[in-house]
Every structure is written in C-alpha cells, then in structure tokens.
Amino acid sequence: MRCSAVSLGSGTIINAIATGFGSAFGVDLKIKADVELIDNGKKIVNGISIDNPTLKPSLVERCVKNVFDHFEVDYSAKISTIGDIPIKSGLSSSSAASNAAVLATIGALGEKVDPDLVLDLAIKSSFEENLTVTGAYDDATASYFGGITVCNNMERKILKKDKFKEDIKVIVLMPEFKKNVDVNRMKLIKDYVDMAFEKCMNGDYYKALFLNGLLYSSALNFPSNISVDALEAGAITAGLSGTGPSYVALCYFEDEKNVENALKKYGETTITKPSNDGAKILY
C-alpha cells in the first residue's frame, strides 16, 4: 500500500500574525511525499527528506501518525519527501510538506480525501511541532487549493478565493538574512495590516501585498528598499513573504529579466509562476 502526493508552496499577500487574518497564493514550487504502509501493528514511522537528508523528518512523521490516529489503524510507515521549495524561506515549505504527507497517507490507506480533514491534520501536526504561530490556515489553503485564498486564520475559514492571471511570473529572492520572528513587534503593526487586508478583501491584491511587505519588513528589520527596487525594475508588486527572509515580486513576462537583475544583487533568485492547480494524489 503506497501513495504519492504533491502540494504547493505559497507566497504571502497578507501575513496573519498581526491580526489573525491573512492571504496567500499558490506558486509552482512543490513538495512531493511518498508513503509506504507496513502492516506490522507497531505504528513506527520513519521519514527522510531525499533532497535535504540533514532535515529532521519530525513534521512529516507526525502527519502520518496523526492520520493513523484519526482512522484508528496501527500500521507502520516509511515516508520520503522531495521538492523545490527552499526550507525556512517564507514560501510555506512546512505547509506544503504537511499537506502532501497527510494527503499521501490518506491515499495509501484508501480512504476518501476530505480537504477539511487534510488541512486540519496538517495544521494540527504543524502546531504540535511548533512550526506555526497562527496555524497558517491561509498558507495551508493556498498550498492545498492553489490560487489566492483570503482567510480568517483564527476560525479556519476561507473568506474568499481568487486567481492571479496566467501571464504573470513570480520572482523569489532568497537573501542570506537572519530569520526574525518577533511576534511582539508584529503585533504592534496590527492596525496598519488591517488597512492592507481591506485592500485584499476588495481584490486589490497587488497593493495589499506591497503594503504588507513594507509593514512586516519594517517590523522585522528586513530592508524595505528591496520591494521598491523591484517596482523600479518593472514589477507589478513585491514584498516580504511570510516572516522572511524571502521576498516575492510579481511581474509580466517581458519584465522578468529586469526584475530578476534588480533582485539578484541581494541574493539567490528563483523564477516561477502562480499556480491554480493545488495539491493532488499522483498515484
């Protein structure tokens, strides 16, 4: 009994830490999880990240165990992951890994896939591994469904779904900045993030993303000029993704090189695109 599933990375439109309300969009970077069940009654789960063997597999192992607990089975399992989402980059690698792990395990068991259950078990696992502050429901839903999701993270409700147009490129900057998750400083900007979220609810995602990026980069001591540099080079919008250190810039195809050149002086870049496809079982 085996199953393979993939889930997307995501970029931030509104970071939910300050207010509990957030928004994210799926990007065409993925993590694939392969699960093999062992019918020995021992409930031992062993995981490995194929492309990053030093990464502790505790999150995906927890996901498998939580699925087993939910369905009250006593299998053991092997789980491996591989993907192209940089770890701890603000591109929702943990949401993608947990979604893919839960989905693959449910598939291996032959159970019906319920998106709400997948998300609940994935978020539960992330909380138990201390990998999330808010539950990251916005990131998890963008990773699972693709497209844009606007969410009440506190109540785990999707308030709105939308899509970016297909003629847009996403340029991801991954600078060598030290990650900073100062929740108290992020709470200070709550009222201003609310204003950016209002833009998001009105469908003005580009302005929302830019304003959110300025606010959170200031609160977390990341450079805000990077986003302005991207605009100067032709980007439609740009901003910090998650709590950083990555930035995302959206641009039209013809401006891709100019925007990439403006960003790559700060660090490594990856070019991708929005994805509206979402998570799926491969086999």
Curated annotation (Swiss-Prot):
Family designation: Belongs to the GHMP kinase family. Archaeal shikimate kinase subfamily.
Organism name: Methanococcus maripaludis (strain DSM 14266 / JCM 13030 / NBRC 101832 / S2 / LL)
Annotated transmembrane regions: none
Residues that, per the record, bind ATP: P86, I87, K88, S89, G90, L91, S92, S93, S94, S95, A96
GO molecular function, one term: shikimate kinase activity
Entries under Pfam families matching the protein: GHMP_kinases_C, GHMP_kinases_N
Keywords for this protein: Amino-acid biosynthesis, Aromatic amino acid biosynthesis, ATP-binding, Cytoplasm, Kinase, Nucleotide-binding, Transferase
Gene expressing this chain: aroK
Cell compartments where the protein resides: Cytoplasm
Stated name of the protein: Shikimate kinase
Domain of life from the UniProt record: Archaea
GO cellular component, one term: cytoplasm
